[in-house]
Amino acid sequence: MALPLLQYKPSSQNHRVTSFGAADQNEDTPYIYRIEDVSSYTDIQNIIWASYRQVFSEHEILKFNRQKTLESQVKNGSISVRDFIRGLAKSEAFYRLVVSVNNNYRLVDITLKRLLGRSSYNKDEQIAWSIVIGTKGFSGFVDALIDSEEYTKNFGENIVPYQRKRMEGRPHNLVTPRYGEDFQEKAGTVQTDWRFTLDKFYSRKSQEKQLREGDPRKFADLAASVGNQGNYAQRISAFDIDYLNAVPNRSRR
């Protein structure tokens, strides 16, 4: 028997504020992709790529992450946009890139942002959904979100999820990398290569080492700055010197 979802209290977020209509429209207002607006091949392609951007995040759209079977099904109308989003979130690529590299709490927050268009309300909500992941698996968690009343009310069958009422700050996909700090050491992003560290340390120490007075190495920079132009002795004959003009005439006042 599956455990019921634990109760949690929603916190204040922009998407919970009643819309003021046109007053809410600004440069941050997202473009809403609807299947009803499709009138050409380009339009359906835009919906597909908007779905990839939302689910996989902007910096994770690569050719080998494409789900061509799902793309074909949504193009010919076999599945709705809702099921296309569901399929992307359950794909092996999403599991490899996002699910496998996060703990359950962070995974809940990321998935809420990408499927429901909002951040988790608080730690209580993260705990509640983490229990769902523990009992039903990630696939069951995705179904719970996609089939939820919140998803149905905001996106229905034919709208690509988007960040709801982003009035300030940057988009979720730019501030939420696919894995957190606890996975960085495993990924090797913070591991130190001691070979380069020691080489850099001893190079700096060599430069800062104090030399004794009179050590020629102290004058290496000075010697290098001296020009290489030769100053050779001039050859001149005594007969070439005009002594009469060279000696001042002291008889004149």
UniProtKB/Swiss-Prot annotation:
> What positions does the domain PBS-linker occupy?
11-191
The lineage's top-level taxon is: Bacteria
Task: Quote the InterPro entries the UniProt record gives.
Answer: PBS_linker_dom, PBS_linker_sf
PROSITE patterns linked to this entry: PBS_LINKER (PS51445)
What biological-process terms (Gene Ontology) are attached? Answer: photosynthesis
Gene3D superfamilies for this protein: Phycobilisome linker domain
* Keyword flag Ribosomal protein: no
Location relative to the cell:
Cellular thylakoid membrane
Q: What's its membrane topology?
A: Peripheral membrane protein
Provide the Gene Ontology terms for cellular component: phycobilisome; plasma membrane-derived thylakoid membrane
Sorted alphabetically, which keywords does the UniProt record give? Antenna complex, Membrane, Photosynthesis, Phycobilisome, Thylakoid
Q: What is its main location?
A: membrane
A Pfam family: PBS_linker_poly
Summarize the protein's role: Rod-core linker protein required for attachment of phycocyanin to allophycocyanin in cores of phycobilisomes. Linker polypeptides determine the state of aggregation and the location of the disk-shaped phycobiliprotein units within the phycobilisome and modulate their spectroscopic properties in order to mediate a directed and optimal energy transfer.
Q: Which family does it belong to?
A: Belongs to the phycobilisome linker protein family.
Query: How the protein assembles, per its UniProt entry?
Result: Part of the phycobilisome, a hemidiscoidal structure that is composed of two distinct substructures: a core complex and a number of rods radiating from the core.
What is the name of the protein in this document?
Answer: Phycobilisome rod-core linker polypeptide CpcG4
Which taxonomic lineage does the organism of this UniProt entry have? Bacteria, Bacillati, Cyanobacteriota, Cyanophyceae, Nostocales
